[in-house]
């Protein structure tokens, strides 16, 4: 099974020694090159990186990579192996292609474990780290185009939980 996990990055950094991982520079069209393949070849939205961040790389991968499975991780956050102790060296805990394939044999989507943040909610975390207006515009678009999804957004935003990576390097 061909699996490609793009490693979203903007600078040189350690990448697992597994051919499944492909480091891709996000926003390559608008930022200085860092030595990795950029998200600005083929069908791409690299020039919109300021608005879409890592999604420019995911868009690039979906339109330019021929793989059975395509995924994305942040350059410092990888999926952790279930087979290794959580006290092991973080770099040795990164999930391998073999282990990921065994998981994908039973499911189509792999997500990290949910983490609980008691200091703030998903909504307050987003507006502190990003732009409140973006979230409000997103809510308005959902209300207008897909109103059946609005109760879910209303449910998720006040929660103090999020799905994030469990293995940071």
Residue ranges and their predicted role:
Residues 1-169:
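ER/Golgi luminal nucleotide-sugar-dependent glycosyltransferases, focusing on the catalytic module
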């Amino acid at each position: 099974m061909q699996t490609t996990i793009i490693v979203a990055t903007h600078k040189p950094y350690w990448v697992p020694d597994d051919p499944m991982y492909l480091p891709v520079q996000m926003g390559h069209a608008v930022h200085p090159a860092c030595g990795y393949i950029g998200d600005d070849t083929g069908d791409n939205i690299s020039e919109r990186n300021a608005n879409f961040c890592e999604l420019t790389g995911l868009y690039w991968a979906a339109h330019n990579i021929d793989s059975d499975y395509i995924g994305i991780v942040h350059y410092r956050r990888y999926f952790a192996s279930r087979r290794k102790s959580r006290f092991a060296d973080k770099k040795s805990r990164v999930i391998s292609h073999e282990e990921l394939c065994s998981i994908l044999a039973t499911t189509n989507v792999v997500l990290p474990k949910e983490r609980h943040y008691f200091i703030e909610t998903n909504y307050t975390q987003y507006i502190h780290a990003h732009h409140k207006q973006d979230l409000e515009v997103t809510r308005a678009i959902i209300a207008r185009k897909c109103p059946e999804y609005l109760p879910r957004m209303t449910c998720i935003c006040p929660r103090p939980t999020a799905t994030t990576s469990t293995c940071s390097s």
